[in-house]
């Protein structure tokens, strides 16, 4: 999309609001939906259910299962205003993995929620640990907690002392990751990473490293958090980038189901894990 600066020059927008404007700017369908909603309710707290939020959550659950065709049919029904069909399609099929969604206001808030959920899970149903392993060169937000998880000195130095409970690992260094787990074991409640790092450059995780992260987390009862603000929503060809990178992992034993990730200001988790906390 072309944007015009205050100097009158035209620019091609490849920034997309630092990765969050996945639908572009001024799309007629988006504007129409916004106008229609503002005539009803401007804001509804997460304490309450509204059907549109439920529809989007069902859509995201299908995408999380890599069911693109099912998501497309559901999306068409939602856009067409066919509430009956949308409601029917939103009901999970027998054996379908259900992913629950918590909607947030920003990526940093969603990331903080994921870290809080990981620690809460560890206390209530997991290993009781509170340490989160994060990748050097990653970026997870600008709150104090997410800066602590962002393992880049030039971003952290101005804000020290930072919250504790975070350990740095070099991306794709399986030996270092194993050494961290050997040293800390059940003190670890989560591994947090971007499947493809964005802020520090385009640095994808390898299948081997993703498999190791998931399997090591499984062994100690920890969770895996994938931050997909920069790489999610089909930017890698799949609905979410982690789906390209888990082909080498143990699909029959998916880290006890304890996987959460977030993209564009929302957080997702497998249904059973969310209900445990």
Predicted features by range, described:
Residues 1-277:
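Conserved N-terminal phosphate-binding loop of PLP-dependent enzymes in the Aspartate aminotransferase
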């Amino acid at each position: 999309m072309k944007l015009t600066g205050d100097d009158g020059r035209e620019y091609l927008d490849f920034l997309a609001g630092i990765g969050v404007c996945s639908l572009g700017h001024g799309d007629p369908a988006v504007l129409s939906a916004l106008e229609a909603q503002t005539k009803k309710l401007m804001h509804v707290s997460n304490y309450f259910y509204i059907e549109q939020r439920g529809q989007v959550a069902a859509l995201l659950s299908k995408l999380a299962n890599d069911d693109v065709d099912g998501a497309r049919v559901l999306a068409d029904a939602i856009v067409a205003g066919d509430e009956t069909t949308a409601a029917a399609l939103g009901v999970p099929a027998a054996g379908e993995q259900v992913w629950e969604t918590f909607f947030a206001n920003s990526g940093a808030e969603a990331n903080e929620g994921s870290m809080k959920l990981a620690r809460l899970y560890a206390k209530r149903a997991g290993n009781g640990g509170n340490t989160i392993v994060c990748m050097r060169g990653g970026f997870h937000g600008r709150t104090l907690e997410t800066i602590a998880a962002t393992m880049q000195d030039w971003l952290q130095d101005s804000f020290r002392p930072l919250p504790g409970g975070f350990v740095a690992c070099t991306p794709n260094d399986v030996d270092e990751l194993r050494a961290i787990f050997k040293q800390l074991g059940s003190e670890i409640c989560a591994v947090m990473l971007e499947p493809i790092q964005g802020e520090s450059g385009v640095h994808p995780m390898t299948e081997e490293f993703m498999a190791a992260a998931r399997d090591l987390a499984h062994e100690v009862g920890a969770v895996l958090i994938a931050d997909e603000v920069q790489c999610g929503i089909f930017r890698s060809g799949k609905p979410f980038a982690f789906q390209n990178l888990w082909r080498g992992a143990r699909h029959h034993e998916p880290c006890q189901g304890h996987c959460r990730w977030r993209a564009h200001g929302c957080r997702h988790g497998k249904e059973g894990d969310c209900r445990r906390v």
